[in-house]
């Protein structure tokens, strides 16, 4: 049984070939922004800037907004000062989109697939979706610190984003923590953005809460990557070695049904704690136990936004 639990450690150390082409085919999903963007750039989301759009904002004097094509006859007739009134609309604008990725040691866990490879696919799908919507996309990777080599400012450079994210298929750093997460919010812009936070969230709840507070100006979508082999597929009977991928520490346990049940219960309790914490910040979590599926992401926005 000892070898069974060590497989995740051994698999995490194996090199994975670069999957640039596979990452590029990460299917996009549909997302919804629940606020009005103040961007001056034309996009697909409701905005606050005056311009071409379908969001009616009222009427104004023709002298102040000389566009006779938008003349409002009814309001013009009703105007006590006999001024010609024209309709005003808010233009559809862009919204900043970020994918924030946990690159700590625990993301090297491999069940059927390495967690980090799943995160790469999700981050690429976020980039694809932002590109389809005409939005700006940025990427931030962190472990013990925010990694500049895996941090991209907001841009429409789709190919650079895809190529940089794909490099993470060859990222295999073990025994490394996640302390940089508390500095990560400093790399987000000041404009309200949609932030996809991709992690297994195997970190203290106090750290998560502190980070959410620092990102309170943004809309955060926590994507929780858990693998059934972490807790559901433990041995029912026999010796096993549990290894912490972030510290390298290991502990040998004698497994029996009661011990396995405690692990499962602990994960369920952890999930409830995470869900409660995220809901306090109006950021319901999306738990992913298997492969990335775009319909799950789309459904999330249909239910949560």
What feature does the model see in each segment?
Residues 54-55:
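Charged, amphipathic alpha-helical linkers/stalks
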Residues 2-42, 60-66, 75-77, 86-88, ...:
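Exposed, interaction-prone extracellular/peripheral surfaces
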Residues 72:
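Short, Gly/Ser/Thr-enriched beta-strand-loop segments that form substrate-interacting elements
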């Amino acid at each position: 049984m000892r070898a069974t639990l060590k497989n995740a450690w051994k698999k995490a150390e194996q090199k994975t070939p670069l999957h640039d082409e596979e990452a590029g085919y990460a299917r996009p999903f549909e997302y919804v922004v629940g606020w009005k963007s103040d961007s001056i750039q034309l996009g697909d989301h409701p905005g606050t800037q005056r311009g071409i759009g379908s969001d009616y904002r009222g009427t104004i004097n023709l002298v102040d907004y000389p566009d006779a094509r938008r003349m409002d006859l009814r309001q013009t007739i009703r105007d006590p000062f006999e001024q010609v009134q024209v309709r005003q609309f808010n233009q559809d604008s862009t919204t900043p989109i970020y994918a924030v990725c946990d690159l700590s040691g625990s993301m090297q866990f491999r069940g059927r697939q390495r967690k980090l490879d799943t995160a790469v696919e999700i981050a690429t799908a976020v980039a694809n979706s932002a590109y389809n919507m005409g939005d700006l996309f940025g990427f931030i990777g962190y472990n013990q610190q925010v990694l500049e080599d895996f941090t991209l400012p907001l841009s429409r450079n789709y190919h650079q984003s895809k190529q940089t994210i794909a490099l993470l298929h060859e990222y295999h750093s073990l025994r490394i923590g996640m302390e940089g997460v508390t500095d990560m919010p400093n790399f987000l812009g000041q404009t309200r953005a949609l932030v996809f936070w991709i992690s297994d969230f195997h970190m203290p709840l106090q750290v998560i809460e502190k980070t959410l507070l620092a990102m309170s100006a943004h809309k955060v979508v926590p994507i929780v990557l858990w693998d059934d082999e972490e807790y559901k597929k433990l041995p029912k009977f026999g010796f096993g070695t549990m290894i912490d991928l972030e510290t390298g520490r290991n502990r040998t346990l004698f497994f029996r049904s009661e011990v396995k049940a405690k692990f499962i219960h602990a994960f369920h309790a952890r999930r409830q704690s995470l869900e409660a914490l995220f809901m306090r910040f109006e950021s319901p979590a999306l738990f992913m136990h298997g492969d990335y599926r775009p319909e799950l992401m789309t459904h999330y926005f249909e239910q949560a936004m």
